[in-house]
């Protein structure tokens, strides 16, 4: 008599967690950080059509890593939820904390009830309404529905340890936009110990902000010449042909 294959609930959860973590780690990293005028998103993303950063509502932004089709479904669902609530009640009733809680409940249900968890990690950010003075809010939502309120910055995807270490050393509160971009890009360029730092330019970065100084819709993408002007100068490699003759 053969017995059916049995796996304990604890083992099943461990295997699901490992699957999700590996899928998220395969992606490229995203940094979201608070600066003097709002929230800055910087994602390592060479694709111009598959975007990791987007607007959810008037004062709320979204960033994600992992499987694109999975986090894009969540993004669209969040937009629909926000639009419906804003229409039924008031636009100010739509908050980042509310959307983060909805995402946490959704991912928690998927993790426990479906055969395969979503291989995604999300960040929901919100800035104060125009004329208000409230600190930006950053929420990290993981694949199992866990939610955390981050005071300064969020790092997701790829190898996060060197990026977090770089931000712990270089992050400053109330930095200007130019300084914040430099801090984020240098942190994203950080590599594991012993490896050379990578060079990131406009063609490999997706950059956007939530600008608390904008009257209604705070979200704005930064591309082209505006992005080039904000990026730190790349070090020039020495060329033997340019050396002066002795």
Curated annotation (Swiss-Prot):
Induction: Up-regulated under nitrogen starvation (at protein level). InterPro entries: Ntn_hydrolases_N, Proteasome_alpha, Proteasome_alpha-type, Proteasome_asu_bac, Proteasome_sua/b. GO terms for molecular function: threonine-type endopeptidase activity. Gene3D superfamilies: Glutamine Phosphoribosylpyrophosphate, subunit 1, domain 1. The lineage of its organism: Bacteria, Bacillati, Actinomycetota, Actinomycetes, Mycobacteriales. The 20S proteasome core is composed of 14 alpha and 14 beta subunits that assemble into four stacked heptameric rings, resulting in a barrel-shaped structure. The two inner rings, each composed of seven catalytic beta subunits, are sandwiched by two outer rings, each composed of seven alpha subunits. The catalytic chamber with the active sites is on the inside of the barrel. Has a gated structure, the ends of the cylinder being occluded by the N-termini of the alpha-subunits. Is capped by the proteasome-associated ATPase, ARC. Transmembrane segments: none annotated. It comes from the Bacteria. Belongs to the peptidase T1A family. Pupylated at an undetermined lysine residue by the prokaryotic ubiquitin-like protein Pup with the help of the ligase PafA, which leads to its degradation by the proteasome and thereby constitutes a negative auto-regulation. The gene is prcA. Component of the proteasome core, a large protease complex with broad specificity involved in protein degradation. The M.smegmatis proteasome is able to cleave oligopeptides after hydrophobic residues, thus displaying chymotrypsin-like activity. In complex with the ATPase Mpa, degrades protein targets conjugated to a prokaryotic ubiquitin-like protein (Pup). Identified substrates of the M.smegmatis proteasome are the pupylated SodA and Ino1 proteins. Disruption phenotype: Cells lacking this gene are viable and grow at the wild-type rate, but show a large reduction in the rate of degradation of the pupylated substrates. Cells lacking the Pup-proteasome system (pup/prcS, prcA and prcB) completely lack pupylated proteins and intact proteasomes; they grow as well as wild-type during the exponential phase, but they show reduced survival after prolonged incubation at stationary phase (17 days after inoculation) and become hypersensitive to nitrogen limitation, and, to a lesser extent, to carbon limitation. One of its GO terms (biological process) is proteasomal protein catabolic process. This is Proteasome subunit alpha. It is found in: Cytoplasm. NCBIfam families: 20S_bact_alpha (TIGR03691). Keywords: Cytoplasm, Proteasome, Ubl conjugation. PROSITE patterns: PROTEASOME_ALPHA_2. It comes from Mycolicibacterium smegmatis (strain ATCC 700084 / mc(2)155) (Mycobacterium smegmatis). The formation of the proteasomal ATPase ARC-20S proteasome complex, likely via the docking of the C-termini of ARC into the intersubunit pockets in the alpha-rings, may trigger opening of the gate for substrate entry. Interconversion between the open-gate and close-gate conformations leads to a dynamic regulation of the 20S proteasome proteolysis activity. PPS auto-regulates its own activity via pupylation and degradation of its components. Peptidolytic activity is inhibited by N-acetyl-Leu-Leu-norleucinal (Ac-LLnL) in vitro. Its main location: cytoplasm. Pfam families: Proteasome (PF00227). One of its GO terms (cellular component) is proteasome core complex, alpha-subunit complex. Pathway: Protein degradation; proteasomal Pup-dependent pathway. CDD domains: proteasome_protease_HslV.
């Amino acid at each position: 008599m053969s017995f059916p294959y049995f796996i304990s609930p604890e083992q099943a959860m461990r295997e699901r967690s490992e699957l999700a973590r590996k899928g998220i780690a395969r992606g490229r990293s995203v940094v979201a950080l608070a600066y003097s005028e709002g929230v800055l998103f910087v994602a390592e993303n060479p694709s111009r059509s598959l975007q990791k950063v987007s607007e959810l509502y008037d004062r709320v932004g979204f960033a994600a890593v992992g499987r694109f089709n999975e986090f894009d479904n969540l993004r669209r669902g969040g937009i629909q939820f926000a639009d419906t609530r804003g229409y039924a009640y008031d636009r100010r009733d739509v908050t980042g904390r509310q959307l983060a809680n909805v995402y946490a409940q959704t991912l928690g249900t998927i993790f426990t009830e479906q055969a395969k968890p979503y291989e995604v990690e999300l960040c929901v950010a919100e800035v104060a309404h125009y004329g208000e003075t409230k600190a930006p809010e950053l929420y990290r939502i993981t694949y199992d529905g866990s939610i955390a309120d981050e005071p300064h910055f969020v790092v997701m995807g790829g190898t996060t340890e060197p990026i977090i270490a770089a931000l712990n050393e270089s992050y400053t509160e109330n930095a200007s936009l130019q300084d914040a971009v430099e801090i984020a890009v240098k942190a994203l360029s950080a590599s594991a110990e012993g490896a050379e730092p990578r060079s990131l330019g406009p063609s490999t970065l997706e950059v956007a902000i939530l600008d608390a100084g904008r009257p209604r819709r705070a979200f704005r993408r930064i591309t082209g010449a505006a992005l080039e002007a904000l990026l730190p100068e790349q070090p020039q490699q020495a060329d033997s042909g340019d050396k002066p003759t002795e």
